[in-house]
Amino acid sequence: MKVTLIAILTCAAVLVLHTTAAEELEAESQLMEVGMPDTELAAVDEERLFECSVSCEIEKEGNKDCKKKKCRGGRKCKFNMCVKV
């Protein structure tokens, strides 16, 4: 009787662990598909950095101050670079 009970509990524990692992694997694969690839994120960051560095290089013309372009995405232009605020 005890052996049967232990066998049933062991099988149940293995089944629960297997199901949990399968769900985690499925969730990870869905996250990888939905997200933006790293290369696209890097291109967006490089574009923002370029825009900011170009706009920060604008100098005064006569008595008028040139307005710098603002960085997008919650970033500010500091030291000729877009930095997160």
UniProtKB/Swiss-Prot annotation:
Postsynaptic neurotoxin. Residues 1-22 form the signal peptide. The keyword Transmembrane does not apply. Coiled coil: none annotated. The lineage of its organism: Eukaryota, Metazoa, Ecdysozoa, Arthropoda, Chelicerata. This is U4-theraphotoxin-Hhn1q. Residues 23-48 form a propeptide. Keywords: Disulfide bond, Neurotoxin, Postsynaptic neurotoxin, Secreted, Signal, Toxin. It is found in: Secreted.
